[in-house]
């Protein structure tokens, strides 16, 4: 009996070590290419990192294991990000949105709201879309509104609509979405080149509410798996 346990225990330990985090939270952009600059002059990377850290904190309090990707600001390769996420059950990339340059500075209220993005080429495309719906539902429940301008060929880029009501669009060729080995979504938290939207999202209470809503949506995604 002793020898049987001696053989079993190392195998059990190996199984524990092999288990990875539940969620990979990817921080969009990096220090050398920080993404859009907000209306108040803050880089998108800094906004993405702050929100991802807050979401990770909420998930951690609920016992969800999170792997933050790109926190050091040095992750230039998109495919390296999805490779680093291997072993996780869900990939979510955190971003903040912009508009086409000709519409800046933003004075039009249509350029506001969150959006979610999926790749229909992802190996778990149906689960990715279902997850995006979960996050959108939690955001809407918390009082955030989806944006729709990305579908417009003039005001946006004519992107394919996956779910209009929830602000979900397709970017099939985006590397962080179509090379992920798990369901994958990209979250645009809001249009930060819009001064009113940026100020609203950076309000501490609103910021906490958004982080909690995103975390709740991601928990719903995990529950469905």
Describe these PLM feature segments:
Residues 21-41:
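Short glycine-rich His-centered loop
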Residues 5, 16-17:
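Cleavable N-terminal signal peptides
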Residues 10-15:
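N-terminal signal peptide c-region/cleavage motif recognized by signal peptidases
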